[in-house]
Amino acid sequence: MEMQLGAMLYVYKGEYGLPSIDFECLRALCLLRFTRCPMDVQTSSNPLRSGAGKLPYLQIGNQKFAGYRQIKRVLDLEGYPIDAHLSTKQKHLSTAYANWVFTNLHAYYHYFLFGEPHNFDTTTRGLYAKRTPFPFNFYYPSSYQREACDVVQVMAGFDVNDKLDKHEGDYLVVNAKKVVNLLSRKLGRKVWFFGDTYSEFDAIVYSYLAIIFKIALPNNPLQNHIKGCQNLVNFINRITKDIFRIEGYSSVKLTKTPSGTEASLTASERKFLDSELNTKIVAGVGAVLAMGAFAAWRGIYNQLTTRSSTDYDGIDYEDDEMEEGLD
């Protein structure tokens, strides 16, 4: 396989200046850009074509490699290992730190983006729906919500489907703040966590913190805490602006960094946001019509065919194996 010939990485398009809205996509992008791998990136993507029902995926010719682990394995084999410049000791430290960050930030990320009802309904659902083709965009984001339910149940011990007063969000916030404090101390005044060279650990930290810090969620206690750690803010902004200056995207330009509770918008931007309700109503009517037409077609088709039906009747999402740590 030649990485230069026809290789393409498919990811969700970004927002709020980020190159992608999704953690897995963002750290896959870090693999490419940190190592300067000569590969094109496609953001107008259909997750259903990945073979796993999700993004990211890498395609080389007719071969597809879905998910971060497979993508990293291909890049390692092709001569673009992200930790090549680290010493053996640093590699072990990187793995240990990554496991600790994963343990304490993964549940926070899933809960506050997908499990917290108001955040999901007002922000996250729309971000993923707009990046998924019609008519799948009306129910595809819910697959991430179901995955978040499993993650939170295993890692935090409560069910996001319970009443809101039973959600132990404070527990997630306390642990996440401890992680941010340690990361800030570990980074200090360095450019990267291990000095002058990037690592997979930098990619993991950036991917978590950039999304949590940049995406304007109504309820996001960690956002202001990150804002108080100026070296981490500089870390996020430097990578976003310098390394992802081409992929970074914003559909609505904010006049200041989102604070999680308010953002200063121009008159035209407010008009854009006010139109969202009308857009959702029209889209909902379209979804009903599309589903009705599909149901009618299925009925006619089943009457005309005698073979047993194994037709597409929804999306089976193959859940990624829960990682015990970030390799």
UniProtKB/Swiss-Prot annotation:
Main location: mitochondrion
TM helices/strands, residue ranges: 281-301
This protein's record includes keyword Membrane: yes
CDD domains: GST_C_Metaxin1_3, GST_N_Metaxin1_like
GO cellular component: cytoplasm; mitochondrial outer membrane; SAM complex
Domain of life: Eukaryota
Subcellular location per the Swiss-Prot or TrEMBL entry: Mitochondrion outer membrane
GO biological process: mitochondrion organization; protein insertion into mitochondrial outer membrane
Alphabetical keyword list: Membrane, Mitochondrion, Mitochondrion outer membrane, Protein transport, Transmembrane, Transmembrane helix, Transport
InterPro entries xrefs: Glutathione-S-Trfase_C_sf (IPR036282), Metaxin1/3 (IPR017410), Metaxin_GST (IPR033468), Mito_Protein_Transport_Metaxin (IPR050931), Sam37/metaxin_N (IPR019564)
Stated role: Involved in transport of proteins into the mitochondrion. Essential for embryonic development.
Family: Belongs to the metaxin family.
Subunit structure: Associates with the mitochondrial contact site and cristae organizing system (MICOS) complex (also known as MINOS or MitOS complex).
Name used for this protein in its record: Metaxin-1 homolog
Organism: Drosophila melanogaster
